[in-house]
Amino acid sequence: KENCCINEILEEILAEYYSIFKRENIIPDINICHEKVYRNLNKNSLIRIFENILSNMIKYSNGDFKVNLERSGTLIFANKAENLDTTTVQKIFDRYFTVENAKSATGVGLSIAKQLVELNDGTITAKYIDGNLVVKVKF
């Protein structure tokens, strides 16, 4: 583990995904706090967590999603997901679970993200709120 700046890593990953956003006609609403948020984490794990969550959001997005990083170290990823429901969201971290209309989904991305978050002493939760899938990560 090393002292990682969550802001910088998140910004790098979002920049790498820019062409995918453009291709998929996704306009992300990104809100990253100005204060640098540092945590003692495995950097490669953090990158993988962000990639897995973003890939999942792209698969299920209806053209939008939100990413927020708060000073507290809480990250919130949200996107419209009208094809989901509360029961489905409860299974979202189960290995091999997929939603029927997922584009090339294998069902391991969020399961791996959960394992990596927990290995880095964080928490990850998913809720279905007003037609949106909201994934919250805390470090």
Positions of PLM-derived features:
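Short helix-loop "hinge" at the ATP-lid/N-box region of the Bergerat-fold HATPase_c
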Residues: 57-58
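Conserved catalytic submotifs in the C-terminal HATPase_c
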Residues: 27-37, 72
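Short alpha-helical Gxxx[C/S/T] motif in the catalytic ATP-binding
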Residues: 109, 113
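Short beta-strand/loop element within the Bergerat-fold HATPase_c
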Residues: 64-74
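Conserved micro-motifs of the catalytic ATP-binding
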Residues: 1-2, 38-42
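Short conserved segment of the HATPase_c
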Residues: 84-96
